[in-house]
Amino acid sequence: MANNTITVQLTRSPIGRLPKHRETVKGLGLRKVGQTRELEDTPSVRGMVNKVYYMVKVVGE
């Protein structure tokens, strides 16, 4: 089984957003706008990305 990863970038600030959404961004390991993280491609990570779709962008899969 291949080690699948996705690259996620924070495109908008979590300031002024719902507290649950801010915690989700923090859970993805994103702090600053423009920061990217390479994460495992799991259903839980995909769900977190879908929850804050308006603040993050999937750069690479």
Curated annotation (Swiss-Prot):
CDD domains: Ribosomal_L30. Keywords: Ribonucleoprotein, Ribosomal protein. This is Large ribosomal subunit protein uL30. GO terms for biological process: translation. It holds the Pfam family Ribosomal_L30. Part of the 50S ribosomal subunit. Belongs to the universal ribosomal protein uL30 family. It comes from the Bacteria. GO terms for cellular component: cytosolic large ribosomal subunit. InterPro entries: Ribo_uL30_ferredoxin-like_sf, Ribosomal_uL30_bac-type, Ribosomal_uL30_CS, Ribosomal_uL30_ferredoxin-like. The keyword 4Fe-4S does not apply. GO terms for molecular function: structural constituent of ribosome.
